[in-house]
Amino acid sequence: MNIEEMSVNAIRVLSADAIQKANSGHPGLPLGTAPIAYELFSKHMNYNPQNPEWINRDRFVLSGGHGSMLLYSLFHLFGIGNLSLDEVKNFRQFGSLTPGHPEYGHTVGVEATTGPLGQGMAMAVGMAMAEAHLASVFNKEGYPVVDHYTYVLGGDGCMMEGISSECFSLAGTLGLSKLIVFYDSNNISIEGSTDIAFTEDVVTRFKAFGFQTIEVEDGNDLCAIGKAIEEAKADKTRPSLIKVNTLIGYGCPAKQGKASAHGEPLGVDNVAALKENIGWPCKGDFEVPQEVYDHYKELSANMAKAEDKWNELFASYVEKYPEMKELWDNYFDGYDMSDLFNSDEYWAKGDKAEATRNTSGTILNMIKKAMPNLIGGSADLAPSNKTNLKDAGDFSKDNYAGSNLHFGVREQAMAAIGNGLMLHGGLKAFVATFFVFSDYVKPMARLTALMQLPLTYVFTHDSIGVGEDGPTHEPIEQLAAFRSLPGFTVFRPCDRTETAAAWMYAVENECGPTGLVLTRQNLPQMEGSSKDALKGGYVIADSQKEVPDAIIIASGSEVSLAVNAKEELIKDGIDVRVVSMPSMELFDKQSAEYKESVLPNAVRKRVAVEALSDFGWYKYVGLDGRVIAMEGFGASGPAATLFEHFGFTVDNVVKTVKEVIG
């Protein structure tokens, strides 16, 4: 067994031992794809194991995140993040750096949190799009300071997921030639052979997408894998699919090629049989010959030279183009937005009724002028979402410098690509669609929140205010779903001022996603709205009494309704406070003193008004309060008719407040 074979087998052995010790995990993928990972990292990756944060590194995304021991074994052997053998031994244990699925921000070297199959594929597309855009912004003749590949590895499961078709269809259209996809084709799924549910010709499918396609017959043939990678890199106009025919659970006589190799430990006897079958020289658990460690150390040292070479190039670049250094720093360290966010223009009150989606579009373009690295788009709804960036160009195969991304009707891919754009670094991204279609993006938004990425989601057409399109297009439960997502901040603004606050928060927030939930219909500009919207909830119209008779809480389009109801109640001698609550998440983060000043415990008579699900409101109104909300689906008809039919009227709010007061 030569040193390369031993180095490949070290990945297999460490993976099998770690999974066996944890008595939990997925050995099939690491055993089958170890040669792909070794060949790629040792000979083709532009990567410095000693600095996994280097901005011009090649990215490798393991879309089949269940095979995480493939990554952890590589990280340990190459010294990436100084991942110790003890951490490998603690695989899947609470508090370890080796969780069951790779987690971005938790384990150094992990480029993306993966596990939900297919999402890693689309995040890789986002990274490749980021590389293409940044290269068009920064590169000068002879100075390719942004010049790297994005590799992604996934199996049959990833290829079955619809998101893979969405993202690769777009990647082919965009001609992302620095995207290289490894297809781990082992023809096995959890339930058995893929023949039971997946018989399509994946290669032909990718040809239709516009990919170069290459096939490696033997997944253990390092030379063939290396040749395929070089062939993929040689194509400068198309992304590439490398189909590698592998054997799941390779090397374990009782398990290889079987579904049982996928998601359970091999068993003590089978681990021993694996080591004997592949000729492993060590008998003990987690034992790797020193010569293998030495080989990986030498590889790591050689790989580090790539960054040294790039540093020299970059130093020469900034010397010749000093103006680009400031631009680079702004892109990668962030723009100072204080001038815009402290300007009178930004906080100017609107002088007429306007849909918050329209207001958002205006503010978005103000932000773009102050933050040129803003990039984003919609799932074929930009004219409705009002997300077009004026004079910023369209991102296309012929113009990677464009900032307007056209995702097509591909909401799932859009959200995951947004994650990839943010993971890459150097850009501030947003994505957009109708709020009712946020159901398509929810799994991807969950990963946005889990990775704490500051991606902005623009959701328009936020309620029964959609009107004539009817219940298929009228969100009900979506707002509650996003409010329940840990780390996701939702804003449902009532007017221009609150929309400005929402965008300011979205831009300045560096930890977690923000969702802007915006109206289709015009809303009045509220006299009492203010920057206090940044606190999540505030008094927008107060009572004259020190202790109000009741409190009405509302968000978005229902805030003006609440204020109008307050004016009617005064005629009957009832003096209420109106609280605008654009963001429950931010309000909940305020001090106890502030929350008491807005919603005093002494005032138990409370009514919340929101034209969506009532889920989540009772923690503010309590057992003595009431919620005016949607209790079922909407209907088709003029918006005004629907609001009246479903009880979102001044009369009903007045009636409900009186009932609560008793």
Indicate where each model-derived feature is located:
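Non-catalytic terminal/interface segments that mediate subunit docking, oligomerization
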Residues: E312-D439, P443-P454, S530-V539, V547, ...
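Active-site nucleophile and cofactor-binding loops and adjacent substrate-binding regions
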Residues: A22-A34, F60-H66, P102-M123, G155-C158, ...
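Thiamine diphosphate
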Residues: Q93-G105, M129, H133-V137, G142-D147, ...
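Acidic-glycine-rich active-site phosphate/pyrophosphate-binding loop
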Residues: M1-V13, M45-Y47, S84-H106, A382-S396, ...
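A glycine-rich helix N-cap at a beta->alpha junction
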Residues: I80-N90, A171-D184, K207-F211, T448-G467, ...
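Cofactor-binding active-site loop characterized by glycine-rich and histidine/acidic residues
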Residues: T33-L174, N388-L389, L421
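Glycine/charged-rich beta-loop-alpha catalytic/anionic-binding loops adjacent to active sites
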Residues: L14-A22, P49-D58, P99-T114, V145-Y151, ...
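Terminal amphipathic helices with adjacent charged low-complexity linkers/tails
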Residues: I55-N56, S240-C252, Q256-D336
